[in-house]
């Protein structure tokens, strides 16, 4: 079986797993996102883009959230996926994700050690970083990794620079295996596709995404299947901090 077949099978399993929120059917958002043009100027640094809170605005937001969610699920590097998202939606120039290292420590749980296949005495490092594109904090990541399974240079970069984890270890040609993927914000209420009475939204108020919109948990492995990192990523509402797509 090819790597592409493996990824297709993995996505199928994830798609069937019950999540805290249902995922918009791929056929719907794939069509929708083709017709969501990007604002000509993009989002100004530090601005808060005002989206209308009506049905169309909420449907656009949902389609874009699901578009990002599937991009994250179908690629091994969340860092490079966010690079592309930042560039496509003109959130900053240059469109490059950087990490802001927070000097705190969170010991790995027994479950994390089990996922990483390490014993109770083996060293596991912790890296806590917001991931920023320009002035926009797009996600925050808790990362536990086994330094003995990285190169000396990779460990140096992780310990001394603002390089995002996925970029620092890119040379390992790692694979990402999703443990869970949850949509934390659902802009439309349950039953929206059936013309629910709940679809009467106020048009005079802006649509403001909450602080957290998507959460992923994943394990990264070497090409031979050896795990070396477990990551918990929480994506912020700032992923939509660009002008609402223009309407006809």
Regions found by a protein language model. Give the residues of each.
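Intrinsic structural disorder/low-complexity segments
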Residues: 7, 37, 219, 225-227
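N-terminal domain-onset segments
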Residues: 42-126, 130-132, 136-199, 204-214, ...
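N-terminal secretory signal peptides that target proteins for export/translocation
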Residues: 1-20
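Bacterial N-terminal signal peptides
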Residues: 25-37
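Charged/polar low-complexity intrinsically disordered segments
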Residues: 4, 22, 109-112
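Hydrophobic alpha-helical segments, especially transmembrane helices
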Residues: 17, 22-23, 35, 128
């Amino acid at each position: 079986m090819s790597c592409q077949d493996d990824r297709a099978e993995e996505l199928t399993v994830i798609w069937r797993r019950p999540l805290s929120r249902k995922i918009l059917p791929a056929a719907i958002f794939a069509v929708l996102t083709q017709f969501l043009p990007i604002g000509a100027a993009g989002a100004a640094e530090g601005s808060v883009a005002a989206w209308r809170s009506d049905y169309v605005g909420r449907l656009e937001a949902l389609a874009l959230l699901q578009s990002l969610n599937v991009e994250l699920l179908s690629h091994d590097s969340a860092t490079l996926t966010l690079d592309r998202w930042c560039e496509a939606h003109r959130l900053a120039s240059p469109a490059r994700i950087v990490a802001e290292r927070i000097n705190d420590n969170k010991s790995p749980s027994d479950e994390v050690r089990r996922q990483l296949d390490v014993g109770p005495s083996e060293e596991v490092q912790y890296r806590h970083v917001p991931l920023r594109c320009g002035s926009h904090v797009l996600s925050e990541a808790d990362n536990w990794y086994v330094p003995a399974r990285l190169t000396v240079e990779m460990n140096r970069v992780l310990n001394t620079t603002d390089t995002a984890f996925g970029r620092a270890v890119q040379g390992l040609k790692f694979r990402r295996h999703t443990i869970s993927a949850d949509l934390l914000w659902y802009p439309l209420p349950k039953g929206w596709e059936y013309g629910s009475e709940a679809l009467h939204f106020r048009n005079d108020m802006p649509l403001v995404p909450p602080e957290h919109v998507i959460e992923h948990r994943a394990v990264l492995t070497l090409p031979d299947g050896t795990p070396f990192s477990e990551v918990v990523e929480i994506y912020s509402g700032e992923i939509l901090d660009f002008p609402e797509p223009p309407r006809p």
